[in-house]
């Protein structure tokens, strides 16, 4: 699922920035 991977990558980056830890 390429679409899933795309949203997953964005979510990972966003999560990392959102949770600056």
Swiss-Prot record:
Keywords: Cell outer membrane, Ion transport, Membrane, Porin, Transmembrane, Transmembrane beta strand, Transport
Subcellular location: Cell outer membrane
Keyword Transport: yes
One Pfam entry name: OmpA_membrane
GO molecular function: porin activity
Primary role: With TolR probably plays a role in maintaining the position of the peptidoglycan cell wall in the periplasm. Acts as a porin with low permeability that allows slow penetration of small solutes; an internal gate slows down solute passage.
Name this protein carries in UniProt: Outer membrane protein A
Naturally occurring in which organism (per UniProt): Actinobacillus lignieresii
């Amino acid at each position: 699922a390429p679409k899933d991977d795309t949203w997953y990558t964005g979510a990972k980056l966003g999560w990392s920035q959102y949770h600056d830890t």
